[in-house]
Amino acid sequence: DRSVSRGLGDVYKRQAYVQWMKEETARKHISEVAVMFDQPYKEPDCEIITTNDIDVSETDTAVYVIARNSGEGADRFDEEGDYRLYPHEKGNIHLLAEVYDKLIVVLNIGGVMDLSEMKSIEGVNAILLMTQLGNLGGDALLDVLIGKVNPSGKTTDTWAKNYMDYPSSAKFSHNESVHDEMYEDGIYVGYRYFDSFGVKPLYCFGYGKSYTDFEIKAGKISVEGNEIQIPVTVKNTGKIYTGKEVVQVYYSATGGVMEKPYQELAVYQKTKLLAPGETEEIVLKYQAEQMASYSEKEAAWILEKGDYIIRVGNSSASTKVAGVIEVCEDIQTLKAKNLFALDVALNEIHPDAVKLEEKKKEEIYDTLLSYKIPCLVFCRALKPDDMLLQTNLLMLSYFVP
């Protein structure tokens, strides 16, 4: 029972509070609200599908929906019925996969969950992430299932193969029953951790399939003032479905003193609806200051000297090097102030720095074998009130087939 009257803390005080609420709602003739206190929400039990249920079905396709609730003030748990499947859910999926020619599993959830076992079940043809779309979500879901609308969404989280692949999983509060949680992930949050530490996820950040295929080609990168511009041509190479693609631009910072992850998302943009064979040219833009790192020593954001590798693709794990921007010297982009100094030092996680630098540059070496790299030098056109140093130069290297 998760009602307020039986929650944590002083039971009598909480019961008195609820009693007052009941009296108040009764006085105002709002009986439905009072009933809610007597009957708090409880997750429904998973229904077991039987062969009798299947016998009345005359279709060759089954759609099985897995639901998980989400909300504020409630941690997720690595347990059945939350992060993991209920035993009944596993049994239902196995049965449906054996009986039906096609099985689609829909995830009506607000966060990640363990899909490794589900992916291993032979006969699961598709997994559709519906998330929580609101009161009209059913209409949107049906449009996608029948092909009226082509899905074009991308994952905003990294879906791990195993719960323990998440860096905080071993020390999260409910695992050790601690009162204080030491945040030791540092800058390695989400895909930054998986990419930098070489942990292969089940589904990477920015992942999402379509009923059609797309070809993404990056053009000549340019720099205007502080703005980096990446022209990209996107073509629907499929023959049946129209669709949209999300082009993603990442950068890898190399050669600096401050620690940096393997790559970070700089900008993304969704195309218009493209018919089979149709092409669209878009220009993705972002400010160079976005690539700066915070220095506690200087109490400032610094765009460090070094190479900044620009990668273009449709997910964090599917990109190609489009060019390299060389920053010739350190640039202070914003002066700040250190606040809330730590009372206890954090033992933050760190990847192998040497291997990480090699990984960042690995794709460049492969690209150099087949591409010529002309170098252009750009002088920043800065406003007087711009905090960047006006004497700095950006040297741009771009790849031309």
Positions of PLM-derived features:
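Single conserved hydrophobic/aromatic residue that forms the stacking wall/gate
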Residues: 1-12
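Hydrophobic anchor at the start of a short beta-strand
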Residues: 10, 101-104
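Secreted, periplasmic, or luminal enzymes acting at the cell surface/secretory milieu
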Residues: 13-41, 108-244, 250, 305, ...
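Hydrophobic helix-and-loop "lid/oligomerization" segment in the mid-to-C-terminal part
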Residues: 20-97, 105-122
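Sec-exported extracytoplasmic/periplasmic mature domains
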Residues: 67, 97-101, 146-150
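Short beta-alpha connecting loops at secondary-structure transitions
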Residues: 81, 123-131, 167-168, 172-177, ...
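Intrinsically disordered, low-complexity Ser/Thr/Gly-rich stretches
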Residues: 198-200, 204-365, 372-373
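Intrinsically disordered, low-complexity regulatory regions in eukaryotic proteins
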Residues: 334-335, 342, 361-401
